[in-house]
Amino acid sequence: MVLGLISLAATVPLTATSVLSLQSQAETRRSQGVDNAWKTNKSYLQARASNRTPEDRKALFDGSKVVLHDGLLYVELQSSAVKRHPFTGYFLAYPDSKYDGLVSTISKDPPQLNWIFLDTSSLQIRHGLRTEAETGITGPFGAVMVAPSEERRILLEGWEGFIAVESNQPGLWGLYFDRYDDALKGRVPEGRRTVELELVHEDIEGDSQQS
């Protein structure tokens, strides 16, 4: 796909040879069959409160989605008056590794790509160039298919540990990863609400990584 070549070359940054290598890897994955083809299709990420969430907070997240804003990933509630750029990306083999990373466009024009990564200090999910991403955890990202709906939910390091933390901006919650399974102990400002999340992979209809 032309977008992938231009965006990666402009933002990761990579040499022309590296960009062509990544495209080749994506083509190889597609050739492996339909079981893997979905990974290279652009998608949105819908955010949903887990079943363990109190009903009053769960309702807040109806129709919410993951967005990118000022180098960070957030959950934007449907009630938000300001609409930010939605996560619009796909899985991509992370350079010089044996695992998949995640990339997303950061704007509509130009449609540049950034890597998605975990800030190891704050445990907030961020986006940036490869040099920025490598200061944090770049993967492995994956997905699990959940029956009976057959929806795919995003994993990081093999599990669903995503948490939304209320921010000081109306309708916007920070996206965090509870890496140590301790409810983000010591990292949540006093008085801020938190919600355990499921991130649902939603294919963009009609899109495929083909030029």
Where are these regions (language model features)?
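Extracellular glycan/ECM-engagement signal in secreted proteins
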Residues: 2-50, 64, 128-129, 134-211
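Acidic, polar low-complexity intrinsically disordered regions
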Residues: 32-141
